[in-house]
């Protein structure tokens, strides 16, 4: 397994701050669904044990649609969605790579998550929210 580092992240106004343990070379997903396209969310899915909300829980509000499984959390002050609980991995946390401090990131490799083929795409990334996840 790749060695982990602690990345720090925040929303635009800084009221919501968090940490996530992830590799310095991040494998991210770009989803082509409507909400991800419109918000520019770049996905890093991790098990809950690797995510820590440091401050700002009181500034988070949720938006749900369609099946209601995904809990899109965004800062009610600046409107940025720094992380959420994804429909593809409802037992994980999905961090917006664009909200991470770039100082701890060496590279970001982006792969497509094809929402038009959601079932196959979801099956391919199911392991991401598991503890000790390694790419298969």
Model-assigned labels for residue ranges:
Residues 1-136:
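A short Gly-Trp-Pro
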